[in-house]
Amino acid sequence: MSQLKPQEVVRLGDIQMANHLPFVLFGGMNVLESKDLAFEIAETYIDICKRLDIPYVFKASFDKANRSSLHSFRGPGLEKGIEWLGDIKKHFNVPIITDVHEPYQAAPVAEVADIIQLPAFLSRQTDLVEAMAKTQAIINIKKAQFLAPHEMRHILHKCLEVGNDKLILCERGSAFGYNNLVVDMLGFDIMKEMNVPVFFDVTHALQTPGGRSDSAGGRRAQITTLARAGMATGLAGLFLESHPDPDKAKCDGPSALRLSQLEPFLAQLKELDTLVKGFKKLDTH
């Protein structure tokens, strides 16, 4: 067993991620649909986050490998996707987060991305976890829909034993019967007890997996309610996907926030985050 412990405060340049600090935003688009759209969404997020003083990391996937249908849009792929993400990083001087699906992808992705993401469905795959941890990049570990919050400790230990202590846990909902996800608010505190920054992926928590027969459905209208509830627990950050026209998005549009609503949405969460983290901590044991 490794003696290494996870970092309570994970640092990325000037950005500090911790449950007691102002929240950090991992935001952008679900999948890279086109380079022009990626630039448009990145610029919108960056401008709004500067106005609201929210630390920001741009998110987009180069491949959606777990689509419901063989005919569903997956993205530009590894080579072109890394190129586009690198262009966004250089043009806007913004840090990048993207997901990795197979062990061979970890090293080349980590050369561009500042944070590499372990997908929820793959979070128990030891070879993938080990390959990602060996890059020494910050790792955002999505909690699988089929795992209890306390089970995330095992994935942290795998990373620590490889020598990587720059770890983040991210809630994205738990399976509740068929085609449904729920978020257990008590799970946030359970994961925070592991002394790692905890994020909330409100976008994918709104999914109804397989709810549209050949693709996932979603409950976009409930995004504000769920985001407020999650952020009220006092978290290190929020994971959010947006689109100018969610109904025309090529992946997970039903769960995406309309880009025109981004600023008022984030302004509310910023105010809530400041309020909650200003409360005196109560000992209720």
Swiss-Prot record:
GO MF assignments: 3-deoxy-8-phosphooctulonate synthase activity
Main location: cytoplasm
Family matches, as Gene3D superfamilies: Aldolase class I (3.20.20.70)
A Gene Ontology biological process term: keto-3-deoxy-D-manno-octulosonic acid biosynthetic process
Location within or outside the cell: Cytoplasm
InterPro entries, per the entry: Aldolase_TIM (IPR013785), DAHP1/KDSA (IPR006218), KDO8P_synthase (IPR006269)
Keywords on record: Cytoplasm, Lipopolysaccharide biosynthesis, Transferase
Chemical reaction(s) catalysed: D-arabinose 5-phosphate + phosphoenolpyruvate + H2O = 3-deoxy-alpha-D-manno-2-octulosonate-8-phosphate + phosphate
Enzyme Commission designation: 2.5.1.55
Pfam families recorded: DAHP_synth_1 (PF00793)
Disulfide bonds: none
NCBIfam families per record: KDO8P_synth, PRK05198.1
Alphabetized PANTHER family for the sequence: PHOSPHO-2-DEHYDRO-3-DEOXYHEPTONATE ALDOLASE
Name by which UniProt lists this protein: 2-dehydro-3-deoxyphosphooctonate aldolase
Gene (name only): kdsA
